[in-house]
């Protein structure tokens, strides 16, 4: 069910990150040699989740693995125990909570009309649902973390903190973000572009669906303008 997916991605997955923040407070202060294997493991996990996203054919599976890959960055940022790392982790958790929930909502909008979640079978929707295509584009851009969204703020803080802590981590971070951009654009092009395969009549998007998307995306824009609310 769509509500379960949205709550799972937006809240329950982030509770794990919050638990790690609490647990790190009782551990000894950070030493590069001690925590480096865990940071590398978290970033490697993020890269593997991103690569898994690239080979997904199911829309909901792709979005779910996307959430897991972002949590890899969050865990790496929490482990190093720096103020910038913790701020970036908190910002990215909140931002990606909104983004992944919005993506699941859009996936359900597509599923209700096509009755399939296979990427290649849902293509050509920009001709039928142009407004939904706009929402897909905006949400994917937020998933990639373009400014001025909260995702950008979070990823910038995490990149700065990790690079300052250990410069070689930038290789894995850069690779992870490159693959994130690749699968996000792949998801957008697969679902929206090309000739449509639908023969039956498709109902237009409802005001309820547009309101849902507005309520997801507006907070992301607003919080990025005043990040003190969450950081």
Curated annotation (Swiss-Prot):
It is found in: Mitochondrion membrane. Its EC number is 7.1.1.2. Its main location: mitochondrion. Keywords: Electron transport, Membrane, Mitochondrion, NAD, Respiratory chain, Translocase, Transmembrane, Transmembrane helix, Transport, Ubiquinone. It catalyses: a ubiquinone + NADH + 5 H(+)(in) = a ubiquinol + NAD(+) + 4 H(+)(out). It is a multi-pass membrane protein. The chain crosses the membrane at residues 1-21, 34-54, 63-85, 89-111, 128-148, 156-176. One of its GO terms (cellular component) is mitochondrial membrane. One of its GO terms (biological process) is ATP synthesis coupled electron transport. It comes from the Eukaryota. PANTHER family: NADH-UBIQUINONE OXIDOREDUCTASE CHAIN 4. Core subunit of the mitochondrial membrane respiratory chain NADH dehydrogenase (Complex I) that is believed to belong to the minimal assembly required for catalysis. Complex I functions in the transfer of electrons from NADH to the respiratory chain. The immediate electron acceptor for the enzyme is believed to be ubiquinone. This is NADH-ubiquinone oxidoreductase chain 4. It comes from Agkistrodon contortrix contortrix (Southern copperhead). The lineage of its organism: Eukaryota, Metazoa, Chordata, Craniata, Vertebrata. The gene is MT-ND4.
């Amino acid at each position: 069910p769509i509500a379960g997916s949205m709550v799972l991605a937006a809240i329950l997955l982030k509770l794990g990150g919050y638990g790690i923040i609490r647990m790190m407070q009782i551990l000894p202060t950070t030493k590069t040699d001690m925590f480096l294997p865990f940071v590398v493991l978290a970033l490697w996990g993020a890269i593997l989740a991103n690569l898994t996203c690239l080979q997904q054919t199911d829309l909901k599976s792709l979005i779910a693995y996307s959430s897991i890959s972002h949590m890899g960055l969050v865990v790496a940022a929490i482990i190093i125990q720096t103020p910038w790392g913790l701020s970036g982790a908190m910002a990215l958790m909140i931002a990606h909570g909104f983004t992944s929930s919005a993506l699941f909502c859009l996936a359900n909008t597509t599923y209700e009309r096509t009755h399939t979640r296979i990427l290649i079978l849902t293509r050509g929707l920009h001709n039928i649902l142009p407004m939904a295509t706009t929402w897909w584009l905006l949400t994917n851009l937020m998933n990639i973390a373009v400014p001025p969204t909260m995702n950008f703020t979070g990823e910038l803080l995490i990149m700065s903190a990790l690079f300052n802590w250990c410069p070689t981590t930038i290789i894995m971070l850069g690779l992870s973000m490159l693959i994130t951009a690749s699968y996000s654009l792949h998801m957008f092009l697969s679902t929206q572009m090309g000739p449509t395969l639908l023969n039956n009549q498709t109902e237009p998007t409802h005001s309820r669906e547009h309101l849902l998307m507005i309520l997801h995306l507006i907070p992301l824009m607003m919080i990025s303008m005043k990040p003190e609310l969450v950081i």
